[in-house]
Amino acid sequence: MKLELRGITKRFGPLTANDSINLTIEEGHIHALLGENGAGKSTLMNVLYGMHQPDEGQILIDGVPVTFKGPGDAVAAGIGMVHQHFMLIPVFTVAESIALGFEPTGPAGIISRERARKTVREVSARFGFDLDPDALIEDLPVGAQQRVEIVKALSRQAKVLILDEPTAVLTPQETDELMTIMRQLADSGTSIVFITHKLREVRAVADEIT
């Protein structure tokens, strides 16, 4: 899936966060958005994810203009996002976290926990994640919690995955593991948007830099 942003402008009152931004994200590439805090990187991705509406400009998927009125529209179009601050509930299990908001249902619409567990196992096996579907989120290290967020996006068929400052809370070892995961995802055809201000990490993993 090829994703394009053309002339995206986003204002908040008198402040212009994004001024006529053009960006192309190619299929299977890791595209880094490099810049200091406050540069407008996260705002631009929130526009792409449907959390903000652009004041000007267009989003195109495979050359076709699309409009996202909310994150649900972006998810349906194949876009996933892992926020810097994870959107997880500590007392939920991994499987419950994956199912939340997108519940695999059984007969009569009842949530199928086994189906949710199966999803975790399948996606984890595909990318070499070590995730126990029945583990509680609050018992997982930060790196594993981040993988839960990635699995959650992939289980919704994300073809473009936005990672917002993903290494900010990781140890050096967890950062190296994430770099490996990103490359595996890209090699499988998933496009990665890597928001960061760390040049060393960009040099290590990015195919393109903006």
Which sequence ranges carry the predicted segments?
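Glycine-rich phosphate-binding loops of nucleotide-dependent enzymes
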Residues: 1-210
